[in-house]
Amino acid sequence: MGTASADILLDGAGIHAAMDRLASEILASLPEGVPVGIIGIRRRGEVLAQRLVHELNRRGAEGLEVGSLDITLYRDDLAELGPQAILRKTEIDFDVNGRYIILVDDVLYTGRSVRAALDALVDLGRPKAIRLVILVDRPGRELPIQADFVGVRVERSDVAVTVLLTESDGAEEVRVG
């Protein structure tokens, strides 16, 4: 369905509230004495990762590293994308070895993007642990992947979910429909 018939699940204030709650949950779970890296899956995951780092720093977290991960070459549907595949740069300026990694994305649906991100991450090294943060979780897994931290859940698998963020889209809302 097009976005014209979509319902707004979260407006800007709802996204802010979900991110605020996620930051609180993540802060409470951070291990002591282990370096932490927060990595967003390009494109909207990187925006959400930046927001999380800002919120965590505001709450007193220290030493957080932030990066972004391009998963294009790790996707299992790359052949289907053909020449339309757009490669973006992975920007992780820290060693992932032995680090507690918080992987961030906007929507978790089939699990295939997260699988690609995990493959890309382990090609960079061996993190101590990887935790998954998702703004919107929806049913429809094709792989056994679950989020550790979820902003909001959509119960129906027959609806499309569109996340718009000011930094990348000029608008701030989550639409379903």
Provide a role label for each language-model segment.
Residues 1-177:
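PRPP-associated nucleotide enzymes
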